[in-house]
Amino acid sequence: MDLLEAGRRFRLPPELLRLYEENGLLQGAQAPDGTRRYGEEALQRAVSFRFLQQAGMELGTLKHFARLAEQGSDTVGERLRLLRRCRCCLLEEIHQKQQALDQVDYLIRELRGK
C-alpha cells in the first residue's frame, strides 16, 4: 500500500514512515508511478516502533532493537533487556507524574479548607 493509505490504515503519519525509512527501520518499494509501497508486515513493525518511541525509546536504541530483531532468536535476551529498560523509564515517569498530581491535589485541598 502507498504512503497515504498506510498512514490512514495504521494511523501512522507519512512523515513518521519517511523517518523510519530514512533510518533503515522500514523498507518500501518504488512503484512504477514513483510512489513508495509498503507491505503489511513492514507496517506492523512500524506500529511497534511508534509505540516504543512513544514509550520513550530513542531512535538510536530503536535502530539497535530492530537490528537485533533481524538477527533472530539468538538476540531475544538483549531485546528483553532493552524493553525492560524502556519499561523502567516509563514507570519512573509515571511515578514522577503521580507525585506532581499528589502535590496539586494537596494544594486543592488546602485552598478548599481556607
Which ranges hold each PLM region?
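Beta-hairpin "wing" of winged helix-turn-helix
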Residues: 27-33, 37
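Conserved beta-strand-loop-alpha-helix junction that forms the acyl-donor binding cleft
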Residues: 10-11, 34
